[in-house]
Amino acid sequence: MKQLTPESRIYVAGHRGLVGSAILRQLQARGYQQLITRTHQELDLLDAVAVERFIREERPDYIFLAAAHVGGIMANQTYRADFIMNNLGIQQNVLTSALRNGVEGLLFLGSSCIYPRLAPQPMREDALLTSPLEYTNEPYAIAKIAGMKMCESMNLQYGTNYLSVMPTNLYGYGDNFDLVNSHVLPAMIRKLHLAGALLRSDLAALRRDVAQRPLEGLTEQSSLEEFTAELARYGITPTSLQLWGTGSALREFMWSDDLAEACITIAERVSFAELYPAGEREIRNTHINIGSGEEVSIRTLATLVAEATHYEGRIEWDSTKPDGTPRKLLDLTRLTSLGYTATTPLAVGIPQLYDWYCQQ
């Protein structure tokens, strides 16, 4: 059972994360019933023995490998060893256990940061490994490339159907809003939310926020003066918000449930042999880009988030901090050939996510 069917026993690895939770929601919406999940407390994917036992006992037919150690520019810069070691460990354990236990179908979630820093835009799948990576997230990217190559190599040697997809920047329900370790859009939402509360001297809103999402040095009992002092560490002041870089970097963003729909469509319809020309001797770049096709500058993104959060203060840019890759837009030719197109533009998704954020 190499492709996903209604009868498949499906393991969603990382079902509490941004991507995994969206895949689980969409599988349930499509009527899939044999769904297997485990929390990190129930199954540590860095524990090879535990992973082997779990897959041997549960016998899934299909695995969505959405579990990963992820974060934004600051986290990637600071915790370089963690990003490469943990991601390689998760991938090694799940993929090899799946292979040993006869799991024929799997979908591996990579990241568009696998592409070279100066790759021609929009980035085609065959841009992989053609020039140097972006330094800030190089360890994470190398780990993801290794996972993709493991899937590709297992397919070629063992006849499995382990597909790899490379999503663009994602956002959605269940996102990580940590001010240090999150990606650009959720971090921006929280910073502008806090900046707006500080601008209005809304102590109740500030306290509610840290009660729901703890922030080092602050509690539900902290005073306005304490909030002002601590939030300054993140560029948040009573009159302005400072963001990293120049704001000129161009990025593509995709609603996580749109990604999930694309992943399930691929799992249902695609076999590995369709992803390279018949008779090809050197088979590579068999992954599939997944994106929205909607590209904005980080500066424009900040404006959209400010509108959604009703922020009326100043936004300033710290050009001494890195912008990351100058432009990242995926070529979606392979995806659109499957008949899939994303349906949630940023102007709709950002307010939806902010409403969800405020309700938590």
Residue ranges and their predicted role:
Residues I84, L88, T136-M148, D178-P186, ...:
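Short-chain dehydrogenase/reductase
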Residues Y135-T168, V184-R200, A204:
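Active-site Tyr-X1-5-Lys
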Residues A48-L88, R100:
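NAD(P)H-binding glycine-rich loop region in Rossmannoid oxidoreductase-like domains
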Residues A13, R38, I63-H69, L106-S111, ...:
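SDR active-site strand-loop-helix element
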Residues Q28-R53:
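Adenosine-cofactor binding site in Rossmann-like domains, unifying the SAM/SAH pocket
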Residues A13-L18, A22-R30, L194-Q360:
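C-terminal substrate-binding subdomain of Rossmann-fold SDR/epimerase-dehydratase oxidoreductases
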Residues P6, Q92-N137, L163, N176:
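Conserved Rossmann-fold NAD(P)-dependent oxidoreductase catalytic core, especially the SDR/UDP-sugar
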Residues V70-G71, S112-P120, T168-Y171:
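Active-site segment of SDR-like NAD(P)-dependent oxidoreductases
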